[in-house]
Amino acid sequence: MLSKKEILDVLKSKDIPKDLLEEAFKVRKFYSGYYVYLRALTEITNICRKSCFYCGIRKENASLKRYYLKFDLINKLFTNIKKLGYSSIALQGGEIFSEKHYFFLYKLIKLAKDKFNYEITISFGELPKDVLEKLYFLGAKRYLLRFEIISPKRYYLFHYKDKFHNYENRIKTLVLLKKIGYQVGTGNLIGLPFTFIKDLYKDILFIKNFKPDMVGIGPYIPQKNTPLFNYLKEGINIFSEKERFLLTLKLIAIFRILLKTSNIVASTALITLGTKFYPLEKVLNLAFKCGANVIMPIFTPSENKRLYSLYEDKYFSEHEKFYFAVKNSDFIPVLDRYGNPLSYYIRNQKSCKL
């Protein structure tokens, strides 16, 4: 177990300490072996009611063309994904509060579970309790909701303080998701302007105590149509791209050591930033050795995926390239198993169905 001093020393170090990397890799091999679970990700809409100051699909971004994928198109995507051998999918989109949207999600989850028998991860923001319960009942067993930054004071540096952006509701929703029975994924945004190492430590402490079944973290990458981008143009101090990349790898290693049995995602943002410095195989090898054991290739149609512009220069890769990049990074890509985390079975005392 890592002490506060050890964690702070790691975060302040210029590189990833060798002993941290060795311990994280040791824990990873014990609980996950060399397996990397692939989830086929589809971003069904870039419509969102929120206006987070760092996010490219914020409601106030009037320059962004909005889309909402049709049911028949998603059905075809699911069919193609199944042909490739996937057993797990992830569905993501902006936060929308409307009965029409809820019923579309119900229909989608029912299709994914009843027709294709997918294990389903969803990420659609802070939806109402009854909607979250019904989505779970229909077959969506995993939910990703990042808290972004755990300090309420810092949280409101990057969000309006209104009914759409409520820190307390965000945390309450995380607790609710776990109570409903979801495998809950959460995480922070690393290296935001106006944040410091001490803020990262608070984020780490929250995740350690919350014990999520999945950790989904990523480095902050600016998006030109956001308020934060304007601050950066004015020369506001920020962690460099290399620092944000290394900090993300350090946090992956820290979480692997602290949580042991949870799944940890090598996020698209991490890959986007990392491939500015290294080839894809090298980035994945580093992430997996630090403890990541999940990646999510994007299956959003090409005409839509660039519109899901959370940040600039997002890395896009076809299934085949990702699959072989995992193999070439000396790990084993897994499509035909659900890849449920051991933490979920331990907490619920269920028999293990990986």
Place the predicted regions along the sequence by residue.
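Hydrophobic positions in alpha-helices of CheY-like receiver
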Residues: 108-112, 177, 255, 259
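N-terminal pre-triad scaffold of radical SAM enzymes
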Residues: 21-61, 66-90, 141
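Core AdoMet radical
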Residues: 59-74, 81-105, 109, 113-174, ...
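Active-site-proximal loop/turn and secondary-structure-junction residues that shape catalytic pockets
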Residues: 42-44, 95-97, 124-128, 149-151, ...
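Generic structural signal for well-ordered alpha-helices
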Residues: 40, 74, 78, 105-110, ...
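Conserved, mostly hydrophobic/aromatic
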Residues: 24, 52, 145, 177, ...
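Catalytic cores of alpha/beta
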Residues: 128-135, 193-207, 272-289
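Auxiliary Fe-S-binding modules of radical SAM enzymes
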Residues: 1-15, 76, 82, 208-354
